[in-house]
A protein has these predicted regions:
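Gly/Thr-rich phosphate-binding beta-strand-loop-beta motif of the actin/hexokinase/Hsp70
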Residues: 73-100, 226
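Mg2+-dependent endonuclease catalytic cores in nucleic-acid-processing enzymes, primarily RNase H-like
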Residues: 1-20, 30-34, 51, 55, ...
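Short amphipathic C-terminal alpha-helix that caps PH/PH-like domains
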Residues: 124, 227-230
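Short glycine/threonine-rich catalytic loop with a Thr-x-Gly-x-Asp
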Residues: 219-220
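Acidic two-metal-ion nuclease catalytic site recognized across multiple nuclease folds
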Residues: 229-249
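ATPase catalytic-site recognition across NTP-hydrolyzing enzymes
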Residues: 15-83
Length: 249
């Protein structure tokens, strides 16, 4: 017999219960908040969000990510970003904004949007201007080169300082994501959950990052790909240190 299956997560994108009914029946937001607090991320997704994940193949574990509550005092050494652009379809455009302090990179903001190209491009411009990003790298695969050109032109027209460069990647995406993950885990800091409670976009990006698996297919790999680009870009900007020493002879 033919059947129609309806899949509905316990909570919506804003963390509000999808099963909170009148007259005291159903499950309210507090109930699901308590459940999430007492379960690991994989169990929560599988049991309540209809998003089963292959636990053994996860590349990023939310518990092992470095977190922060506020930026260090003082001016950052640099503000950079990298953008995994989107064309048409269901892919997401992802652009983390990193504040560098010494050897650490604080993920202060992130765009994770699958809206129309026009809306996304406008948001990219606004984000680069807001954070006064000095250098940004856009992928030039597919339509990325044209998007980078349009965003750069608009940033300059509005008095921005961002210098956008492009890079075409020939490496296998999954291999690149895996190889760059140690740098992300060691050097990148993400906002604490208490800070992003009402930041739907940041939470969505974290969920996609920690949902990436090496053991099967991924519905969305845009976020881990963007952080791979960030890691590669950050390392490319590190200049060699020259030390003066006494000639031994």
């Amino acid at each position: 017999p033919r059947a129609k299956f309806i899949v509905m997560p316990a909570v919506d994108e804003n963390g509000e219960s999808n099963f909170d009914y009148k007259y005291g029946v159903g499950f309210d937001k507090k109930y699901f908040d308590d459940m999430k607090e007492n379960l690991d991320d994989c169990s929560w997704r599988a049991l309540f969000m209809n998003q089963p994940i292959e636990r053994e193949g996860l590349l990023y574990n939310e518990d092992e990510l470095r977190r922060y509550f506020e930026l260090p005092s003082g001016t950052p050494d640099a503000v950079i970003s990298a953008c995994d652009t989107k064309d048409k379809g269901k892919d997401f455009c992802v652009m983390p904004v990193l504040y560098q302090y010494g050897n650490d990179y604080y993920v202060e903001d992130i765009i994770c949007d699958n809206s129309s190209p026009e809306i996304v491009e406008s948001r990219l411009v606004s984000c680069l201007l807001k954070h006064k990003v000095k250098a940004s790298r856009f992928e030039s695969n597919s339509a990325g080169g044209k998007i980078a050109e349009k965003v750069q032109r608009e940033v300059r027209a509005q008095g921005g300082i961002t210098n956008i460069t492009t890079k075409y990647s020939t490496a296998n995406k999954d291999t690149r994501i895996i190889v760059d993950s140690p740098f992300v885990k060691e050097r990148f800091l993400f906002k604490d959950d208490s800070i992003i409670k009402n930041n739907q976009e940041y939470r969505r990006a974290l969920g996609m990052l920690c949902g990436y698996t090496m053991a099967g297919k991924n519905a969305h790999d845009d976020v881990p790909d963007a952080f791979s680009m960030c890691a590669d870009f950050a390392q490319s900007l590190v200049t060699a240190q020259v030390k003066v020493f006494t000639r031994p002879f």
